[in-house]
Amino acid sequence: MSKKVTETVEQLVTPILDEMGLELVDIEYVKEGKNWFLRVFIDSDDGVDIEQCGAVSEKLSEKLDEVDPIPHNYFLEVSSPGAERPLKKAKDFAKAIGKNVYIKTYEPIEGEKQFEGELTAFDGTTVTLLVKDRGRQKTVAIPYEKVASARLAVIFF
């Protein structure tokens, strides 16, 4: 049901975002404790502010009331993806070149399934990271289809 809900919400929110010059980053439909949450993460090249989030929430809420894809009560949250935004699409990886990222893979690459480092290149098929390994820097090439999840990483020194 979760996948069906997120697909329906994506179809409903995309025209709203296109009209406002915004982009969809991610949709989450999750149960936390007794409550269900529908979270829609939006962004633009200039970032998003609370007024834009509120406007999207209002318009999307109207559409959700019309279509009613969720049979029970839930909380709708519309926000920016934050500093550690997920990288979901190829264009997200391309935009993140030069930034620090955290990647989990479906299977081990060079004996590891988790990587954190600078995204140095992305050609559509391979994600290239510069990572620290025992005090030295090394390059790791990760096949794009083996990426289970990825996000920007905030590094604290």
From Swiss-Prot:
KW Transferase (keyword) present: no
Principal localisation: cytoplasm
GO biological process terms held by the UniProt record: ribosomal small subunit assembly; translation
GO cellular component, one term: cytosol
InterPro entries: Ribosome_maturation_RimP, RimP_C, RimP_C_sf, RimP_N, RimP_N_sf
UniProt keyword annotation of tRNA-binding present: no
Coiled coil: none
Compartments, as annotated in UniProt: Cytoplasm
Domain of life, source organism: Bacteria
Keywords, in A-Z order: Cytoplasm, Ribosome biogenesis
Stated family: Belongs to the RimP family.
Function: Required for maturation of 30S ribosomal subunits.
The protein's name in its UniProt record: Ribosome maturation factor RimP
Organism of derivation: Geobacillus kaustophilus (strain HTA426)
